[in-house]
Amino acid sequence: NFSVEKGEFIAVMGESGSGKTTLLNIIATLDKATEGSVFIGGKDVNSLSNSEVASFRREKLGFVFQDFNLLDSFSNRDNIYLPLVLSDIKPVVMNEKVGEIAPILKISDILDKYPYQVSGGQKQRVAIARAIITKPDLLLADEPTGALDSKSADIVMKTFCDINNSGQTVLMVTHSVKCAAFAKRVIFIKDGRVYHEIYKGSDDNLTFAEKINQAQIMLNGVNNYEK
């Protein structure tokens, strides 16, 4: 069991097959848990009807994926607009919302370009803008830097920190120690169970990354013993 408090930035780590993506899919209402409960904002997501799931997902959750999931036939601006269009938001309000977040994500100068005209790091920042434009209760990120080079990954992770510092709750699955070190807490899972968790506290990223490495070594030792 674990909980995510409002305003937290949590990274989830574990070996391939440990259940990281399954966990994210259950929280995202894409899969249903075979046992237990998942509460988001006081609602048990497993109890939602099919008609309720779509609106809940649209209003309460934001998603950032490894492969960006942007539509090349839409401008970056229109890609960001998409969840607002689905919620029947007026164009003038959409413009205001994009105007608020574009400077924060440093994408103002690429809004009218298309995804194929910008870099991978810029694409991911557009994807983040699309994910947070509705001000979701929870932002879910699945390996958000997996398709990026080191420099672009650093920029994207600093972007996550910026939006988290503004109050956005973030839950991120990653295999990267460097990326996990940007989070305020790291949860380690194996076979669908929480094995360990560590808090960043006042540590800098380098110190926290070393603690994450040490935790992984410890857990791998447990795994080898079990095998």
Where are the predicted features?
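Short coil-to-helix segment of the ABC ATPase nucleotide-binding domain corresponding to the Q-loop/switch region
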Residues: 74-82
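The feature captures the beta-strand-to-loop junction immediately N-terminal to the Walker
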Residues: 13-15
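Conserved ABC transporter NBD signature motif
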Residues: 36-44
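Catalytic Walker B motif of ABC-type/P-loop ATPase nucleotide-binding domains
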Residues: 139-142
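Helix-to-loop junction immediately C-terminal to a conserved catalytic motif
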Residues: 28
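A short, proline-enriched helix->beta-strand linker immediately N-terminal to the Walker B motif
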Residues: 133-137
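Conserved ABC ATPase signature
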Residues: 114-118, 122-124
